[in-house]
Amino acid sequence: MSIKAEEISALIKQQIENYQSEIKVSDVGTVIQVGDGIARAHGLDNVMAGELVEFSNGVMGMAQNLEENNVGIIILGPYTEIREGDEVRRTGRIMEVPVGEQLIGRVVNSLGQPVDGLGPVETTKTRPIEGAAPGVMDRKSVHEPLQTGIKAIDALVPIGRGQRELIIGDRQTGKTSVAIDTILNQKDQDMVCIYVAIGQKESTVRNVVETLRKHGALDYTIVVTASASQPAPLLFLAPYAGVTMGEEFMYNGKHVLVIYDDLTKQASAYRELSLLLRRPPGREAYPGDVFYLHSRLLERAAKLSDAKGGGSLTALPFIETQAGDVSAYIPTNVISITDGQIFLQSDLFFSGVRPAINAGLSVSRVGGSAQIKAMKKVAGTLRLDLASYRELESFAQFGSDLDQATQAKLNRGARTVEILKQGLHKPLRVEKQVAVLYALTKGFLDDVPVSDITRFEDEYLTWLESNRKEVLESIRTTGGLPEAGLFESALEEFKKTFIASE
């Protein structure tokens, strides 16, 4: 076999012509300590705060503490395979999650990776999880109602699109049920819902997803989950991942509802990370910036101005209290950040008042501007009536010789409490709520026995649907009460057919 010099020289020339003298510079460090979801690395001198870094086994981390000699990294995945001396390299990217329509109907983790077994999420768009909240001039005051479908909330503590309303209460008082019912009521309301489960049992998250699927609510809902078995960094990041996914829709002129269930567990995870990163502890061993942890999250909820597209992001953060103590550190922090709170009380819950909303301690700082005109008219005095009933009720236990006015107040109050009770996963459209509350406030229920109130409500609404559909239709379309006398005549006609059980 003869070797041709021309062929060899031609090949060498071709290789020289195609030679690319690119030098890839990658910033590489060395792990000097690892454990409990935290790694310390030496040598990453140019790393950015919040930057993603990659360990030699492919697990990602996020740079948190930038110190003189080393970098504190929170590990976003299993850390047992990472060893002292392993390489860790910069990616040049800030922590980001996938966003877009393709996420709707999916269950994802804090990193936006699907965990529902339905294959990958087909989206190429991402957003950084830490983003600036809309400025003062980019916002508009909250004026559109967000109907939860829960009478006690829509009448007493109305929520508007773009508001932040805290739901606070002990464990097992129905906080998650309020969230699920609110999501179910957003059907056909052109609203994207995001349910963020932080530190929940996986069985609980499964039940929530199945409930949403059964009622057809998964068609407009994204579920972000960081279960109790996952490392603290993922629990800490879950709410930010949820709000980032929501912001993508908000900035495109859509309306979004984000539910954080619950932020107490996020604060605990952040405390754990901060102590492991050797940051100085403060009150209740929380780090000094635990207020900023929640404020920068909740400030990203907004009603955008028309110039910015008029989209909105409504936040419903949950806080779990211990023995009803709303004056603890985290509850007071979040109360001061939000635009009101709904307080769920275990005493009410166990006495059969469900949803167990304490009307005296619950407040909405947006108030009437987040209600339709009809609801404002029928629910105007409801709150005061309920408060005075609770006061009179405690006095009435001591004596029976009450004057007629007091007795009338007690009777009306008992019926009000009964009307505001509501079954699980049975949200009511606002026009039906108005119809029922009109009957209550105008005294049409005063002669109906308390034990029959729920039956009266169900039968009356069914009767209205069949015989006076135009009354409900006018409330739905105009937002105001129907013409004078229409409700009265309907109620009088229905009451003739209603048979009390006594």
UniProtKB/Swiss-Prot annotation:
Gene Ontology CC terms, in alphabetical order: plasma membrane; proton-transporting ATP synthase complex
Keyword flag Heme: no
EC identifiers of the protein: 7.1.2.2
Membrane topology listed for this record: Peripheral membrane protein
Keyword Methyltransferase listed: no
Subcellular location as annotated: Cell membrane
A Pfam family the protein falls into: ATP-synt_ab_C
Function of the protein: Produces ATP from ADP in the presence of a proton gradient across the membrane. The alpha chain is a regulatory subunit.
Family: Belongs to the ATPase alpha/beta chains family.
Protein name: ATP synthase subunit alpha
Source organism (scientific name): Priestia megaterium (strain ATCC 12872 / QMB1551) (Bacillus megaterium)
